[in-house]
Amino acid sequence: MKALLRALIGQGIEALRANGTLPGDTLPPDFVVERPKTREHGDFATNAAMLLAKAARSNPRALAQALLTALPDSNDVTKVEIAGPGFINFHLAPTAYQREVAHVIKQGHDYGRGLAGNGRSVGVEYVSANPTGPLHVGHGRAAAIGDSLARVLDANGWNVKREFYYNDAGVQIENLALSVQARAQGLTPDSAGWPENGYRGDYIADVANAYLAGDTVDMEGHLVTGTKDPADLESIRRFAVAYLRNEQNHDLAAFRVDFDIYFLESSLYKDGKVEEAVQKLIASGHTYEEGGALWLKSTDFGDDKDRVMRKSDGTYTYFVPDVAYHLTKWQRGYERAITELGADHHGSLTRVRAGLQAMELGIPQGWPEYVLHQMVTVMRDGEEVKLGKRAGGYVTLRDLIEETSADAVRWFLIARKPDSQLTFDIDLARAQSNDNPVFYVQYAHARVCSVLRQAQEKGYKYDQVHGLAELARLDDEHSLAVMLELSRYPEVVEIAGQTLEPYQIAQYLRELAHAFHTWYHNSKVLVDDAAERDAKLTLAVATQQVLANGLELLGVSAPEKM
């Protein structure tokens, strides 16, 4: 619909150039066509006249009137009016929305998919949990947001690579190995000899028992076997990391989350990428030595203070491998790099960008982009869920999926802005009622499937071509409300991709489901008149298609029965 109006406005601008209202060399401005906040102001509005007023040396409202007069006639536009300082509002005819139903039917699964990315490359990194324990609900929110964001970007024409970064070279891994070793030697977290910074969750005992039993773990095709020797710390380290990575992969698979690339922090050291990044920074002239340490002049690039890169003992601070890792993303050809992180990591944003800018390699400012999510509180029976002992103080993603469903967990972890704190209500997520948004949306899809089955049981032969030809019959308030929502879907997908906010898809699906349920309750679908029945079934099938398309972007199933 926007394309139709942009074409009409473009023709109007050409007419104003032809009659001298606009100078002949006036270029069409980058005007917007958008939906007003309220329907009283029409279906769409444009600011074209306000942008052209200076070139025409005219009052914006006066130019808006001239542009309005110059617009060609269209059967899809019933009224055009001027509002405010020079906006032009368009009211569309039912035929415009009825035609959109035909577009949904014709394009099917591709309806709503766009070409904004034009095949350009984008790397989306998310979850990136340390392989030191089970995935908790915070990791789950990262997984849901990151995976849905990757799906939305793919729907917008980007060549998306999904990436998981394993921090397998830090002090946490050493603490993990020492904790498993202590368990293997018969100690408990309350024992006097327990490691000072050891992990206390019951899962550590599971790892130790598997190691002592000589179990073999498949870590993405590499088999790692426990040697049963509690004194072999290096063997314990390898086995524990493999065991917990395997556990995390199991949970992510159950959550319908997968990755194209698993990148190990340890490979940065093994392949010399950390040293390469350090040498590039030294060569750039943005480093200095002080107190036996190597510093980055990160204040030259927006940081609040300079940062130590290499400590006096020769070891690197944690942000250096982060810079090296993101340098590899640039070297791998990502035009965009997007990292989804917990909000507690916000301090690393500026220093990583500063390190990349200091290399003077032409990396754009603001690269990489970040999406930060806030914490999740889990509630049951109106009370906060006690932290799980097995995970050592966290509610695990696995527990949530088992108590509710992958669909419910994904929906609720996506459905609010990432930067807002989220309360996950287990009782609501399990409820089969209209108060549960994922149930409400999925039921709309299942309801269409049910109507189609009923039509078949009654012996009605649904003729979709006939239904498309008879859509003009559906000009009542509730039918048009559904059509309007269907027409919004491509815009919502595009905006969600631009803003990196997949929650907008969830909000939209609730609104579409509401319009559909309202229409269904106010309009008998399986009527005797074949023309009217086919038209209504066609509208229902179009709704079913858009619901399925949107749910797929969220990684939520579209059930046929409920």
Swiss-Prot record:
Main location per the UniProt record: cytoplasm
GO cellular component: cytoplasm
Motif segment ('HIGH' region): 129-139
Localization annotation: Cytoplasm
GO molecular function: arginine-tRNA ligase activity; ATP binding
Alphabetical keyword list: Aminoacyl-tRNA synthetase, ATP-binding, Cytoplasm, Ligase, Nucleotide-binding, Protein biosynthesis
Family under the similarity heading: Belongs to the class-I aminoacyl-tRNA synthetase family.
Protein name, UniProt field: Arginine--tRNA ligase
Organism, as annotated: Xanthomonas oryzae pv. oryzae (strain MAFF 311018)
